[in-house]
Amino acid sequence: MGWITEDLIRRNAEHNDCVIFSLEELSLHQQEIERLEHIDKWCRDLKILYLQNNLIGKIENVSKLKKLEYLNLALNNIEKIENLEGCEELAKLDLTVNFIGELSSIKNLQHNIHLKELFLMGNPCASFDHYREFVVATLPQLKWLDGKEIEPSERIKALQDYSVIEPQIREQEKDHCLKRAKLKEEAQRKHQEEDKNEDKRSNAGFDGRWYTDINATLSSLESKDHLQAPDTEEHNTKKLDNSEDDLEFWNKPCLFTPESRLETLRHMEKQRKKQEKLSEKKKKVKPPRTLITEDGKALNVNEPKIDFSLKDNEKQIILDLAVYRYMDTSLIDVDVQPTYVRVMIKGKPFQLVLPAEVKPDSSSAKRSQTTGHLVICMPKVGEVITGGQRAFKSMKTTSDRSREQTNTRSKHMEKLEVDPSKHSFPDVTNIVQEKKHTPRRRPEPKIIPSEEDPTFEDNPEVPPLI
């Protein structure tokens, strides 16, 4: 059985960002709704309302929907037209395939002056004699009835014959009401008989029968002591019984009434619950995965089945997990232990035994914003065990070394010694060399007599040889 809840309306209001109070169109078809409620309080601005193919038996709680223009109540269990006077803007009403037998109840629509279209096909009243003439004469504002346009001549004839048609419609209504009363009594009687049969089946004897045969019971008890029937056979017999009951229900002829529709709904609900119970039984509860054995030894487990890489350096161990890129970080839980690391990804454990002992307190876990990978850095413990004695290595970090270097520098004053011959840059002063001033006229070279020629005489009047 379906109820109109706030959650149901919000789920069907995605086109309005799940906002209820400003909804103008709402579709609640095929929700097995049996009663109209809460809509007039939560969605007062509705203009279009779809409620077809439900189990609504009465039109109610819609009088506050002043802006409602189209109401679809096809394929329901409505037997009377009522409580629509408050829908002032109602222009179209669809009541196809219902159980409306009181045709005179359409007089309640005379106050809806904007009503232009009405659908009543598939109802018991549609088979009455002079049904169309009565509706056309009763509702002068109508322009379309059952998808056919109402012509002025048709309305004039209906108004002329209204005094004759009305008593005939009243008689047909009375006959229909008597038939409905009989059908209701038969439905109640069948329902009571079915309840009694169910009580008998549930309160049957220990042997599953209402008679007691001593020989049969003794033989059954002895057989139970010696041989136990397997569970599969019992399950098969139950399954056969259920299938037989189901076939019997669907093959049983019945009238198309509101009670029969409700009965089919109840039967479908029972079958659904049985299937849910069977599926719950079939579901095998997975045993808890063993991460640490009874001896205290950690195991390697990769239940989420993700890729990973492990890098073992001298100082630290780096684990790179290929976590899904768009997974929320709140779904990841990291636990670093001295000998193993455990990562819970959406409740599934990933555990890896480390090749060396690490420091859990100094470990860090970071996640990449581009790839989504999880990188866990785990520094190693500087402890080496040799021959029963423990020798501790002082694992100095870069910060400790830098501190020692600064302390030694502060103790000894260092001076900067520079060799001018080892300059890496040129001397700016020697880039351009100054040229000495030379006269334009070259001096005449002096003729120096060679010592080898003793007969040489210098004559100044003779020009020099070139």
Swiss-Prot record:
Q: Where is this region: Disordered?
A: 185-206, 268-288, 391-466
Q: Where are the LRR repeats?
A: 22-43, 45-66, 67-88, 89-110
Disease (UniProt):
Ciliary dyskinesia, primary, 19: A disorder characterized by abnormalities of motile cilia. Respiratory infections leading to chronic inflammation and bronchiectasis are recurrent, due to defects in the respiratory cilia; reduced fertility is often observed in male patients due to abnormalities of sperm tails. Half of the patients exhibit randomization of left-right body asymmetry and situs inversus, due to dysfunction of monocilia at the embryonic node. Primary ciliary dyskinesia associated with situs inversus is referred to as Kartagener syndrome.
**How is the subunit organization of this protein annotated in UniProt?**
Interacts (via CS domain) with ZMYND10 (via C-terminus).
Q: Write down the species.
A: Homo sapiens (Human)
Top-level taxon of origin: Eukaryota
One GO term describing the cellular component: cytoplasm
Coiled coil location: 178-204
Q: What is this protein called?
A: Dynein axonemal assembly factor 11
Question: Changing C87R: reported impact?
Answer: In CILD19; no effect on interaction with ZMYND10
**Keywords (A to Z) from UniProt:** Cell projection, Ciliopathy, Cilium, Coiled coil, Cytoplasm, Disease variant, Flagellum, Kartagener syndrome, Leucine-rich repeat, Primary ciliary dyskinesia, Repeat
- Residue ranges, compositional bias (Basic residues): 269-287
> Which segments constitute the LRRCT domain?
123-161
Q: Name one GO biological process term.
A: cilium movement
Q: Where is this chain's protein located in or outside the cell?
A: Cytoplasm; Cell projection, Cilium; Dynein axonemal particle; Cell projection, Cilium, Flagellum
Q: In which tissues is it expressed?
A: Expressed predominantly in testis and in nasal epithelial cells.
Q: What is the effect of changing D146H?
A: In CILD19; no effect on interaction with ZMYND10; reduced expression in cytoplasm; decreased expression of inner and outer dynein proteins; mislocation of inner and outer dynein proteins
A Pfam family (short name) is LRR_9
The protein's job, in short, is: Involved in dynein arm assembly, is important for expression and transporting outer dynein arm (ODA) proteins from the cytoplasm to the cilia. Acts as a crucial component in the formation and motility of spermatozoal flagella.
